[in-house]
Amino acid sequence: MCLRIGSSTRQNGRVNKEAVELFCAILALATLAGGIITLAALALEERMTWTNAWLTQVRASGIWIICLITTGAMLGSLYFSEHVGFAPCKLCWYQRIAMYSIAIISFVAALRNDKNIVRYTIVLAPMGLVVSTYHYLLEWYPNLETNVCSLDVPCTAVWFRELGFVTLCFMAGCAFITVIAVSLAVMRGQKIDSTSIHQEN
């Protein structure tokens, strides 16, 4: 009887983990879609009518959007490492440093309504994106490994691959791309506001 209960618990745990993996994958793709739309709106600003409405919303809530994305990514990474038991490699830690830093400073900035924080997010996010992109390539092409990681926790290990291509570092990359897009939108909005003020004076 005890063996059956233990087996059932492990099975339920596995189902829950797989459900979380799928949920996080879908959430990452939705985040990426938002980032791509924002980048497209920036490229087409003043050429298409829908871009103004989209960018207005992004600029108004930009810091909270960045905070929400990075905090979600931070909590997700902690769930997989601390609860599920996925050991983070050295590249994972580099991505965490960038992601966690953005999450903390954006939360403080959001509380203070300080949009100048994008000066830092626009630096940290690309750095994280470079690492996550390289990490993602290693997952598909292990021969690109340059002895960056240890043998105990190799960077080429793939804990899961949802929908055939979504891995943990892919999710991180989606978050970094969207943070970059939102940061650019906020920065351009600040520039437009500054130009308008100078013209009025």
Language-model regions, residue ranges each:
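Cys/His-coordinated zinc-binding microdomains
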Residues: W93
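Secretory/periplasmic and organellar redox-cofactor proteins
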Residues: C2-K90, M99-I102, S106-N201
